Regions:
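Polysaccharide-binding surfaces and accessory modules of carbohydrate-active proteins
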Residues: 164-177
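Catalytic and substrate-binding regions of extracellular carbohydrate-active enzymes
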Residues: 1-157, 163
Length: 177
């Protein structure tokens, strides 16, 4: 594989991303990032309407009112994996789950990355118990996975409290094993 070129992308935070394909388990491969002229090839955007991520394998849609994942499907499959209330919802309660509260306001939904390798949407929200809540949702080219990174700028609250992120999947007759 020496000299084989792979797509690279500089992410919003300065890190580099690329997809390392066909690496057997418990093995390794060495990649080197070298500077070159900017590629003239255009990549296909994985973001639509600033609320939909689609890498050709999975499609994720963000609810603009709650910031949850309102739709989660495999491309070409009509089955909806997200329940009606949406995935990655924020739930804040007092001790013993008293006084449940959710997202107060979506401040903005913005594109962090949209390149040849990865696409990320950031949902910034006003949420109880937090100064700010950021929920980043990422898809990668050619990978059937969605990454979620939730970051809380937590308020200094001395009372008992619970913070949860809930993922109610649309599963008929779920069985816990």
């Amino acid at each position: 594989r020496t000299g084989e070129k792979v797509e690279t992308q500089r992410l919003y935070d300065g890190r580099w991303a690329f997809v390392a394909e066909n690496i057997p388990a418990l093995s390794s491969e060495v990649y080197q990032i070298v500077s070159k002229k900017k590629s003239s090839r255009r990549f296909v955007s994985m973001i639509a309407e600033n609320k939909i991520l689609n890498n050709g394998i999975v499609r994720v849609e963000i609810d603009e009112g709650k910031g949850t994942i309102s739709s989660f499907k495999r491309v070409g499959d009509s089955y909806e994996y997200a329940s009606n209330s949406g995935l990655n919802d924020y739930l804040y309660t007092g001790r013993y789950a008293s006084d449940p509260q959710g997202i107060e306001q979506i401040l903005n939904i913005r594109v962090l990355d949209d390149g040849a390798v990865a696409a990320t949407l950031r949902i910034e929200s006003k949420a109880p118990g937090c100064n700010t809540l950021w929920r980043d949702v990422t898809v990668y080219k050619g990978i059937d996975r969605v990454d979620i990174c939730n970051t809380l700028d937590k308020q200094d609250i001395l009372d008992f409290e619970n913070v949860r992120f809930v993922f109610p999947f649309n599963i008929q007759q779920p069985e816990i094993t």
